[in-house]
Amino acid sequence: LLDSGAPTDEEAARRVLSKWTDLEAFVAYAVVDRAIHHDDGPFHWYCIDGPCEPHNFYFYEEPASRRVHIIPWDLDNSLQGWTPEALNPVTAMPDAFGDTSNACDPFPFGSFNLLQRSAGCDPLVAAWASLDDEFERIDNNFRSGPFSIESVTMHVEGWRDQIAPHVAEAAALHDDAPSVAEWNSSVDQL
């Protein structure tokens, strides 16, 4: 995918990624991934028992168009780590998207000091992260649109209204179910 000088040349990166991906969708994936803190996915390179590598995603190639798409999975640790106190000791990431640390050598990080390497040291991630204009435009649109406080609050409140009767029913029937007050408190944290 990246054998055309893309990691060091922004125009080459754009050219190569445009050839093999839907560039808008590829950048939008990175925007959403970083916005929801999918810190246990393609931008977290663990160095445990072998080479440093990311996980929890697949690349899918459409045979007819020969376009590559990234498919995330195992997003259970997403939407965590909004504050330093809430950082997950395993999935905590030291670098912003595309940044590098420790001259690209593995280093311990997080409260468990897990060995990891900056994702920006990978040629594909470096090329991806070099698309600053696209990233900024898509990120601004995302954060002022579907990920805005108003939009997210509207959806969460709608889901609260749909789910609340079932939470009350479960709380009345099961001793181990959260109370309605506990559930509402958790929803309010969102």
Label the model's feature ranges.
Residues L1-F57, E62-L190:
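Middle-to-C-terminal accessory/interaction subdomains
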